[in-house]
Amino acid sequence: MTPAENLDSHLRNIIEWHFNPETGCDFWLDWAKNAGWDPRKEVQTFADLDKFPHFEDVWLRDEQNERFVPRGFGDRPFNIFETGGTTGVPKQRIGWDDYKVDYEEFGDNLNDEFFPRSGKWLMMGPTGPRRLRLAIEHLANYRGGSCYFVDLDPRWVKKLIARKQFDEVERYMKHVVDQGVEMIKHRGVQCLFTTPRLLEALAERISIARCGVKGVFCGGTSMTPQMVRFLMEEVLEGKSQFVPTYGNTLMGLACSLPDTLRANNYSVTYWSPQPRAVLRIVDLKDTSKIVDYDEYGRVELTTMTKEFFMPRFLERDEAIRRKPCDKYPWDGVGDVRPFGALEKKVIEGVY
């Protein structure tokens, strides 16, 4: 079965699950009733998803979480994960095991030389109500280790930046980095997850590689080739492996090929975890059209699992459409940056 055939088959199973009155959730069953057509009959290939409108993330804020629970899961308790939001009611996604599937697949692709089995992990970043906290701990456990945590509240940082309280931002960053330094120095940390900004701040205090950190798994809104080169060659001194990822609560995790970064002039391409999620790069003005390879466009995400169906969601990011590769034989997204980054100032805070 080709990747496209596998994707179509997976999609049909997911559509059947979410729009079957016995297994689907109230939200999608009510949506189909109001839309006046049956996705189980009319969606047979991935191209047919264009019959759906773009998923609106405000639905995740305005709807009660229970309306997204598939009837096929019965009364099984669910996790609640938040995404984005600085003020007001946050947007939330419910879940059960998707984060485990995503991060086990990611963990299977980590290099044991740089991310040792049974190694100690440190997560230095947003925990709290985010999926990432459980995901990183599960990743550490899955690979035989345990995980320490240093929490960070990005919502608070964004508020401080918006109020131009930059001294407070610096004090808060120091508070977070101080904790990370102590953990790395005294707990034998070998594997680290953090954001690019925090990684850079850590390196201003200690030599991360000489303190024993062998691998760094990093996530952030945007990482230019210049930033990637700086982090790999200066911050990590060319010694610890740098593994950039692109992910969020709604998608899971899109992986890169860390061993190819130098050969590609530090430009990062990410591939989604198909068939569970698909990333497309669509035209900025006509989102029904996919851009040509090597052109910039807006990132469109479709998530398709039994836990969560989200068609054609327009991310607040733009990227270059990249060609498939041997390991991931489907389109990738490269040089991700905030949507409209060239036209307006975007607050990324500590990412």
Which residue ranges define each predicted feature?
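Nucleotide 5′-phosphate-binding alpha/beta core
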Residues: 1-82, 88-120, 125-129, 142, ...
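Conserved short alpha-helical elements in the N-terminal third of ANL/AMP-binding
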Residues: 133-147
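Flexible domain-boundary/linker segments
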Residues: 28-31, 35, 100, 138, ...
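Short, conserved acidic/polar surface loops in the N-terminal third of protein domains
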Residues: 92-96, 132-135, 160-161
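Active-site glycine/GP-rich loop and adjacent strand/helix microenvironment
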Residues: 1-17, 143-351
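Glycine-centered flexibility sites
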Residues: 24, 36, 85-88, 133, ...
